[in-house]
Amino acid sequence: LNILVVGGGAREHTICDAVCRSKNAYLYSVMHNMNPGIQRLSKEVLLEKDTNVKSIVEFAKKKKIDLVVVGPEAPLEVGVVNELEKNGIHASSPTREAARIETDKEWMRNLLKKHKVCGQLKYESFTDAKKAKKFIEDFNGEVAIKPIGLTGGKGVRVSGDHFRGIKEAVAYVEEVISEKIGGSAKVLIEEKAV
């Protein structure tokens, strides 16, 4: 069985290790930066951006890959699984549409609201920091601030842990919007969960 793992982080290293402990499995990898641990385990490594869908699909076809495991969210967001499946290559990871629950925080919150999932936090999305300030004030600064898109686990900031008070919260909202952190000039703010 030829297995391709996309991604070069610790999560993917653990997956690669498990693949190599399986009988009759051959590991191939795609990663942006070389992870020496994954390199040692792999029959072959393609050093490439994990969002380069065309290169990943071509590599998978060339190596006659039976199954692809995608670790990071960014390749899921750009539809790597969708393209692999169009080319008859199986993947155990979600399609772009299924991964949206992880890649778009606003969409996820709206989905939960639409289906009346219990335990919803109060939230709003903003493209204007002045309007966001009112929402932050309503919660006395006790909020979580989340860029809408992917930030590699580095974008969410929570009062008490990452900022203190309304002024610092608004400053981070301004930064997210002006710098388009997460790829969009938009931020999701929700009440802080205790």
Where are these regions (language model features)?
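Glycine-rich beta-alpha junction loops
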Residues: 33-34, 149-151, 193-194
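ATP-binding N-terminal substructure of ATP-dependent carboxylate-amine bond-forming enzymes
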Residues: 1-97
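Glycine-rich loop at the start of a catalytic domain that most often binds anionic cofactors/ligands
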Residues: 80-87, 106, 158-161
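Structural motif corresponding to alpha-helix initiation and N-cap regions
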Residues: 50-54, 129-130, 166
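Conserved ATP-binding module of the ATP-grasp superfamily
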Residues: 67, 110, 118-121, 142-144, ...
